[in-house]
Swiss-Prot record:
Gene3D superfamilies assigned: Isopropylmalate Dehydrogenase
Record-stated family: Belongs to the PdxA family.
Keyword Transmembrane helix: no
UniProt GO molecular function: 4-hydroxythreonine-4-phosphate dehydrogenase activity; cobalt ion binding; magnesium ion binding; NAD binding; zinc ion binding
Gene that encodes the chain: pdxA
Protein source organism: Shigella dysenteriae serotype 1 (strain Sd197)
Top EC class, one word: oxidoreductase
SUPFAM superfamilies noted in UniProt: Isocitrate/Isopropylmalate dehydrogenase-like
EC number: 1.1.1.262
Subcellular location(s) of the protein: Cytoplasm
Annotated protein name in UniProt: 4-hydroxythreonine-4-phosphate dehydrogenase
Co-factor binding comment: Binds 1 divalent metal cation per subunit. Can use ions such as Zn(2+), Mg(2+) or Co(2+).
Cofactor(s) needed for function: Zn(2+); Mg(2+); Co(2+)
Reactions performed catalytically: 4-(phosphooxy)-L-threonine + NAD(+) = 3-amino-2-oxopropyl phosphate + CO2 + NADH
Length: 329
């Protein structure tokens, strides 16, 4: 790494395990400076509950970034709206969560931070607070004014990107258009090159229907939409295989010769990845003008403050972000 960079972290839902995980992250040394966008008392209280040492130092944007020292976190303060009891949601703190996301996103956009790592949020409590919120991905897409973003989940062995994300099954076929596929594949290909350092990405593309349509007998989206798009992009030099049946694609025969899989919808690609690497997966938002990774699990309210939360996914998300920073320098 040419120089020390700052990585901003949002712990997510304050009543969940996000603050616990951030405190656990702070127990290690890191080659970047970790800047946590959160309430100071929340972090110190949670550290005390876990019996872990934690010192907070104020964020100073005009001073050089310093590598992370164990037991110390740099704090970018955002105040809670209500006091927090571990495991108990408070509706007003939905506003707090969104404020942390907005400040962290803006800091990435203006160059303060080299990457953003997000902890798990509780979408229900944010919406109950009167804030329309579908998820991190859509929030950052809108706030950064990105033209289009792509959700990708990854473990060390497998990367799965999604052509569509949070859509009902009945709407997915209509959403799979030539324009969408062109856009999604272009973003996936570009970010695999620029953020993952893969010179010539090899992408496996799932079909939409069982058996990838069985030659048109089980659906025509492959023949009418997916195959023509793949042919066009192959003619431009992209290394694309498919459309392949999703029930046979996820095996070494195909995966050993690929850098990523493009699934047509959420529950086509992610069950395999989460089974293969649950607790080690990372959510990456492609197409943003900055690096964003996230844990692949929820708030686990029942574990908050108990010292039982697994920090593995957060560590993987941070390590991946650091690698992506290096690749973009």
């Amino acid at each position: 790494m040419v120089k020390t960079q700052r990585v901003v972290i949002t712990p997510g839902e304050p009543a969940g395990i996000g603050p616990d995980l951030v405190v656990q992250l702070a127990q290690r040394e890191w080659p970047v400076e970790l800047v946590v966008c959160a309430d100071a008392t929340l972090l110190t209280d949670r550290a005390a509950m876990l019996g872990l040492p934690l010192t907070l130092r104020p964020y100073s944007p005009n001073s050089p970034a310093q590598p992370q020292t164990a037991g110390i976190l740099t704090l970018l303060p955002v105040a809670l709206r209500e006091s927090v009891t571990a495991g108990q949601l408070a509706v007003e703190n939905g506003h707090y969560v969104v404020e942390t996301l907005a400040r962290a996103c803006d800091g990435c956009l203006n160059g303060e931070f080299a990457a953003l790592i997000t902890g798990p949020v509780h979408k229900g409590v944010i919406n109950d607070a009167g804030i329309p919120f579908t998820g991190h991905t859509e929030f950052f897409e809108e706030r950064s004014r990105a033209k289009k973003v792509v959700m990708m989940l990854a473990t060390e062995e497998l990367r799965v990107a999604l052509a569509t994300t949070h859509l009902p099954l009945r709407d997915i076929a209509d959403a799979i258009t030539p324009a969408l596929l062109h856009e999604v594949i272009a973003i996936l290909h570009h970010d695999l090159r620029t953020k993952f350092g893969i010179a010539e990405p090899r992408i496996l593309v799932c079909g939409l229907n069982p058996h990838a349509g069985e030659g048109g007998h089980m659906g025509t989206e492959e023949i009418g939409t997916i195959i023509p798009v793949l042919d066009e992009l192959r003619a431009q030099g992209m290394k694309l295989s498919g459309p392949l049946p999703a029930d046979t694609l996820f095996q070494p025969k195909y995966l050993d010769n690929a850098d990523a899989v493009l699934a047509m919808y959420h529950d086509q690609g992610l069950p395999v990845l989460k089974y293969q690497g649950f607790g080690r997966g990372v959510n990456i938002t492609l197409g943003l003008p900055f690096i964003r990774t996230s844990v692949d699990h929820g708030t686990a309210l029942e574990l908050a403050g108990r010292g039982e939360a697994d920090v593995g996914s957060f560590i993987t998300a941070l390590n991946l972000a650091i690698k992506m920073i290096v690749n973009t320098q």
